[in-house]
Swiss-Prot record:
Cellular component GO terms held in the UniProt record: chloroplast
Compartment(s) where it occurs, according to its Swiss-Prot or TrEMBL record: Plastid, Chloroplast
Entry superkingdom: Eukaryota
Keywords for this protein: Chloroplast, Plastid
Name of this protein: Uncharacterized 12.7 kDa protein in 16S-23S DNA spacer
Organism annotation: Auxenochlorella pyrenoidosa (Freshwater green alga)
Main location: plastid
Length: 110
């Protein structure tokens, strides 16, 4: 429950902020809450911001908050990474890591 409240606050904070630096710090803090590796976080943040996929990343994180990780599907993860310029093995590695972290978070939440 506390994780959902923190994510909700962070996402609401993003809505009221238009500065790129604040958005970047926000995403890093959300990804830190999800306990992604620093490498994965940097790739997702930097690539999503430069490729204007920030809204997809926020949408993914919002789905995580609302459904507490239960509704996150492989297709949703792939759509977040779809237009990011990474090779398939990098995308697969990130998806696998996100899934393992969401699974661990799911056990903590429920």
């Amino acid at each position: 429950m506390a994780l959902s409240n923190i994510l909700l606050f962070k996402i609401e904070f993003y809505i009221f902020s238009s500065l790129l630096m604040i958005k970047k710090k926000l995403v890093f803090s959300i990804l830190k809450l999800l306990q992604l590796t620093e490498k994965d976080s940097k790739i997702l943040v930097n690539e999503s911001l430069t490729n204007k996929n920030f809204s997809k990343l926020i949408e993914f994180l919002d789905n995580y908050k609302v459904e507490k990780a239960k509704s996150i599907t492989l297709q949703q993860l792939q759509s977040v990474l779809q237009n990011i310029k990474l090779n398939n093995s990098q995308k697969s590695e990130i998806i696998e890591n996100i899934y393992s972290k969401l699974d661990a978070a799911n056990h903590l939440i429920f």
